[in-house]
């Protein structure tokens, strides 16, 4: 059995790490490189960096900090933000990233997933999915351009259908960003994770809602996700990664203990 992964998420805006609630009202957390170093030292399995306004601004992630991060950490990291071509991805990987993640650009051009997978291999290609639970229709809807409140919009994709589609096109991993839960720390949406796990045959990463060590345990035990991504509980030092992994190991979760 592959070890489960603990993945701190660093949302980047204007060169700094920020964090919002339900993808809104972002506050500055700190500088990128020191936070990356801290999480690597605490025992994170990998890091994910989202340049949250790159797609909505029509630009590619700033590659200068990608190179700085690569110099100071020795764990894998994934970068996302406005990657719209094989050339964009090539530059980011050349600067030191281990994976690239696409979200809004994949929705605009689904063939991008296949082109990237063909060039770099599926293991290198992550698709992020921003999913919103609509109570009226009792359905999960995919959203686009979520880094900018003014441009955020619902797409025509139901989350379940998009999960199936991106796998067919070559996604090697899926990060499910559950917008309703984002930043509120009341637990991952286990119902949604279980539904998507049933149709997802590549590694599935839960994102949005972690507030306690028990929430991580529930995601691994009850939804069988491959990794759990979180931000605010790590940024605000509510949960220490090393202590979290020790707890999960004691609960029988296969995990790399620091």
From Swiss-Prot:
Its EC number is 4.3.2.10. It holds the Pfam family His_biosynth. One of its GO terms (cellular component) is cytoplasm. It catalyses: 5-[(5-phospho-1-deoxy-D-ribulos-1-ylimino)methylamino]-1-(5-phospho-beta-D-ribosyl)imidazole-4-carboxamide + L-glutamine = D-erythro-1-(imidazol-4-yl)glycerol 3-phosphate + 5-amino-1-(5-phospho-beta-D-ribosyl)imidazole-4-carboxamide + L-glutamate + H(+). Keywords: Amino-acid biosynthesis, Cytoplasm, Histidine biosynthesis, Lyase. GO terms for biological process: L-histidine biosynthetic process. Pathway: Amino-acid biosynthesis; L-histidine biosynthesis; L-histidine from 5-phospho-alpha-D-ribose 1-diphosphate: step 5/9. Coiled coil: none annotated. It is found in: Cytoplasm. It comes from the Bacteria. The keyword Nucleotide-binding does not apply. The active site is at residues 11, 130. One of its GO terms (molecular function) is imidazoleglycerol-phosphate synthase activity. Its main location: cytoplasm. IGPS catalyzes the conversion of PRFAR and glutamine to IGP, AICAR and glutamate. The HisF subunit catalyzes the cyclization activity that produces IGP and AICAR from PRFAR using the ammonia provided by the HisH subunit. Heterodimer of HisH and HisF. Belongs to the HisA/HisF family. HAMAP family: HisF. This is Imidazole glycerol phosphate synthase subunit HisF. It comes from Yersinia pseudotuberculosis serotype IB (strain PB1/+).
């Amino acid at each position: 059995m592959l070890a489960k992964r603990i993945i701190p998420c660093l949302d980047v805006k204007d060169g700094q790490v920020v964090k919002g609630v339900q993808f809104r009202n972002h506050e500055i957390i700190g500088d990128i490189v020191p936070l990356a170093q801290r999480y690597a030292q605490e025992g994170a399995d990998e890091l994910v960096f989202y340049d949250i306004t790159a797609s909505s601004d029509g630009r590619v992630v700033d590659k200068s900090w990608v190179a700085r991060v690569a110099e100071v950490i020795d764990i894998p990291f994934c970068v996302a933000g406005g990657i719209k071509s094989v050339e964009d991805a090539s530059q980011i990987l050349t600067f030191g990233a281990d994976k690239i993640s696409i979200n809004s650009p994949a929705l605009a051009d689904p063939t991008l997933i296949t082109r990237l997978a063909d060039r770099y291999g599926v293991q290198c290609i992550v698709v992020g999915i921003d999913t919103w639970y609509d109570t009226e229709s009792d359905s999960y809807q995919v959203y686009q351009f979520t880094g900018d409140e003014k441009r955020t919009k619902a797409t025509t994709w139901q989350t379940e259908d998009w999960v199936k589609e991106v796998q067919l096109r070559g996604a090697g991993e899926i990060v499910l960003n559950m917008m309703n839960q984002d930043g509120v720390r009341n637990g991952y949406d286990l119902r949604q994770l279980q539904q998507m796990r049933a149709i997802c045959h590549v590694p599935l990463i839960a994102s949005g809602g972690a507030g306690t060590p028990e929430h991580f345990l529930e995601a691994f035990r009850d939804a069988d996700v491959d990794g759990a991504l979180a931000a605010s509980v790590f940024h605000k030092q509510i949960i220490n990664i090393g202590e979290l992994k020790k707890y999960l190991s004691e609960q029988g979760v296969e995990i790399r203990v620091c």
